[in-house]
A protein has these predicted regions:
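A short hydrophobic beta-strand segment most commonly corresponding to one strand
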Residues: 83, 97-114
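Conserved short histidine dyad/triad with adjacent acidic residue
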Residues: 21-23, 36-51
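Glycine- and acidic-residue-biased ligand/ion/polar-headgroup-sensing regions
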Residues: 53-55, 59-65
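Short acidic-glycine-tyrosine-enriched beta hairpin
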Residues: 71-87
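A short, N-terminal "cap"/entry segment at the start of jelly-roll beta-barrel domains
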Residues: 1-33, 117-154
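Short, charged/polar surface micro-motifs in flexible loops or helix N-caps
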Residues: 29-31, 41-44, 64-66, 108-111
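Short beta-strand His + acidic residue motifs that chelate non-heme Fe in jelly-roll/DSBH
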Residues: 48, 67-68, 84, 90-96, ...
Length: 154
Protein backbone atom coordinates (compact mmCIF):
# COMPACT_ATOMS: atom_id res chain seq x y z
CA UNK A 1 0.00 0.00 0.00
CA UNK A 2 1.12 3.57 -0.65
CA UNK A 3 -0.28 6.82 0.75
CA UNK A 4 0.15 10.46 -0.28
CA UNK A 5 -0.92 13.28 1.99
CA UNK A 6 -2.37 16.23 0.02
CA UNK A 7 0.10 18.57 1.71
CA UNK A 8 2.98 16.47 0.34
CA UNK A 9 1.77 16.28 -3.28
CA UNK A 10 4.19 17.86 -5.76
CA UNK A 11 2.32 20.24 -8.11
CA UNK A 12 3.93 21.67 -11.26
CA UNK A 13 2.83 23.32 -14.53
CA UNK A 14 2.52 20.96 -17.52
CA UNK A 15 5.23 21.12 -20.20
CA UNK A 16 2.94 22.16 -23.06
CA UNK A 17 0.05 24.24 -21.68
CA UNK A 18 1.30 25.28 -18.23
CA UNK A 19 -1.67 23.67 -16.45
CA UNK A 20 -1.02 22.95 -12.78
CA UNK A 21 -1.03 19.19 -12.10
CA UNK A 22 0.27 16.54 -9.75
CA UNK A 23 1.28 13.05 -10.88
CA UNK A 24 -0.34 10.89 -8.21
CA UNK A 25 0.63 7.58 -9.80
CA UNK A 26 4.31 8.48 -9.97
CA UNK A 27 4.40 9.83 -6.42
CA UNK A 28 2.71 6.64 -5.17
CA UNK A 29 4.96 4.34 -7.24
CA UNK A 30 2.17 2.93 -9.43
CA UNK A 31 3.66 1.09 -12.41
CA UNK A 32 0.54 -0.25 -14.14
CA UNK A 33 -1.56 2.91 -14.39
CA UNK A 34 -1.35 6.67 -14.55
CA UNK A 35 -3.30 9.14 -12.40
CA UNK A 36 -3.06 12.90 -12.13
CA UNK A 37 -4.99 15.77 -10.65
CA UNK A 38 -5.30 18.72 -13.03
CA UNK A 39 -6.35 22.20 -11.88
CA UNK A 40 -7.63 24.28 -14.81
CA UNK A 41 -8.04 28.00 -14.18
CA UNK A 42 -10.65 29.92 -16.20
CA UNK A 43 -9.41 30.24 -19.79
CA UNK A 44 -7.00 27.28 -19.58
CA UNK A 45 -6.99 24.06 -21.57
CA UNK A 46 -5.07 20.84 -21.41
CA UNK A 47 -3.57 19.58 -24.65
CA UNK A 48 -5.74 18.20 -27.45
CA UNK A 49 -4.19 14.75 -27.62
CA UNK A 50 -4.68 11.02 -28.01
CA UNK A 51 -3.07 7.81 -26.81
CA UNK A 52 -2.24 4.65 -28.73
CA UNK A 53 -3.11 2.19 -25.93
CA UNK A 54 -4.26 4.08 -22.84
CA UNK A 55 -7.92 4.24 -21.84
CA UNK A 56 -8.50 7.31 -19.65
CA UNK A 57 -11.14 8.08 -17.05
CA UNK A 58 -11.90 11.80 -16.62
CA UNK A 59 -13.67 12.78 -13.38
CA UNK A 60 -14.62 16.37 -12.49
CA UNK A 61 -13.98 16.86 -8.76
CA UNK A 62 -14.66 20.62 -8.60
CA UNK A 63 -16.47 22.96 -10.98
CA UNK A 64 -18.25 22.19 -14.23
CA UNK A 65 -16.00 20.41 -16.70
CA UNK A 66 -15.85 20.83 -20.46
CA UNK A 67 -14.35 18.02 -22.52
CA UNK A 68 -14.16 17.53 -26.26
CA UNK A 69 -13.79 13.91 -27.38
CA UNK A 70 -13.33 13.61 -31.14
CA UNK A 71 -16.21 15.74 -32.52
CA UNK A 72 -18.38 15.60 -29.39
CA UNK A 73 -18.43 18.45 -26.86
CA UNK A 74 -19.41 17.41 -23.33
CA UNK A 75 -20.38 19.45 -20.27
CA UNK A 76 -19.70 17.42 -17.13
CA UNK A 77 -21.19 18.16 -13.71
CA UNK A 78 -19.17 17.90 -10.51
CA UNK A 79 -18.47 14.20 -9.82
CA UNK A 80 -19.45 13.31 -13.39
CA UNK A 81 -17.16 10.97 -15.32
CA UNK A 82 -16.25 10.14 -18.92
CA UNK A 83 -14.31 7.10 -20.15
CA UNK A 84 -12.22 7.82 -23.27
CA UNK A 85 -10.91 4.94 -25.37
CA UNK A 86 -7.43 4.83 -26.97
CA UNK A 87 -6.94 6.76 -30.23
CA UNK A 88 -9.85 9.13 -29.51
CA UNK A 89 -8.72 12.76 -29.53
CA UNK A 90 -9.58 14.49 -26.26
CA UNK A 91 -9.17 17.91 -24.66
CA UNK A 92 -10.44 19.14 -21.30
CA UNK A 93 -10.75 22.91 -21.08
CA UNK A 94 -12.21 25.64 -18.90
CA UNK A 95 -14.43 28.24 -20.55
CA UNK A 96 -16.22 28.98 -17.26
CA UNK A 97 -15.50 31.63 -14.63
CA UNK A 98 -14.47 29.16 -11.91
CA UNK A 99 -11.56 26.77 -11.41
CA UNK A 100 -11.96 23.12 -12.32
CA UNK A 101 -10.27 20.17 -10.61
CA UNK A 102 -10.05 16.96 -12.64
CA UNK A 103 -8.87 13.48 -11.77
CA UNK A 104 -7.53 11.75 -14.88
CA UNK A 105 -6.59 8.08 -14.49
CA UNK A 106 -5.53 5.72 -17.25
CA UNK A 107 -4.16 2.29 -18.06
CA UNK A 108 -1.95 0.94 -19.39
CA UNK A 109 0.47 3.83 -18.92
CA UNK A 110 2.37 5.25 -21.89
CA UNK A 111 5.53 7.38 -21.93
CA UNK A 112 4.59 10.92 -20.96
CA UNK A 113 7.87 12.81 -21.34
CA UNK A 114 7.05 14.95 -24.36
CA UNK A 115 10.48 16.58 -24.15
CA UNK A 116 12.05 13.22 -25.15
CA UNK A 117 9.66 12.40 -28.03
CA UNK A 118 10.51 12.58 -31.73
CA UNK A 119 8.76 15.07 -34.02
CA UNK A 120 6.78 12.19 -35.55
CA UNK A 121 5.61 10.96 -32.13
CA UNK A 122 4.57 14.48 -31.13
CA UNK A 123 2.66 15.01 -34.40
CA UNK A 124 0.63 11.84 -33.80
CA UNK A 125 0.03 12.59 -30.11
CA UNK A 126 -1.02 16.21 -30.78
CA UNK A 127 -2.89 16.34 -34.14
CA UNK A 128 -3.25 20.16 -33.91
CA UNK A 129 0.10 20.82 -32.27
CA UNK A 130 0.98 20.70 -28.58
CA UNK A 131 -0.50 24.09 -27.65
CA UNK A 132 -3.75 24.21 -29.66
CA UNK A 133 -6.65 25.87 -27.87
CA UNK A 134 -10.26 24.82 -28.46
CA UNK A 135 -12.52 27.21 -30.42
CA UNK A 136 -14.28 28.09 -27.15
CA UNK A 137 -11.04 29.67 -25.92
CA UNK A 138 -10.17 31.44 -29.16
CA UNK A 139 -8.40 28.58 -30.93
CA UNK A 140 -8.82 27.84 -34.61
CA UNK A 141 -10.83 25.13 -36.29
CA UNK A 142 -10.12 21.62 -35.14
CA UNK A 143 -8.43 19.39 -37.71
CA UNK A 144 -9.48 15.82 -38.18
CA UNK A 145 -6.73 13.33 -37.40
CA UNK A 146 -5.45 11.64 -40.54
CA UNK A 147 -3.45 8.60 -41.50
CA UNK A 148 -3.77 4.85 -41.13
CA UNK A 149 -3.10 4.95 -37.39
CA UNK A 150 -6.11 7.20 -36.75
CA UNK A 151 -8.90 5.09 -38.23
CA UNK A 152 -10.75 5.03 -34.89
CA UNK A 153 -9.79 8.57 -33.89
CA UNK A 154 -11.93 11.62 -34.53
Amino acid sequence: MAHLDPADALWRPSNQMGVLNTDLAKQLGAATMGARLWRLAPGQASTRHRHRETTELYVVLEGTGRLRVDDELLTIATHGAVLVEPRSVRQPFNDTGAEQLWLVAGAPPEPANTLAMTAEELAWLYPDGPRALPPELGGGELRRAEGPESEQAV
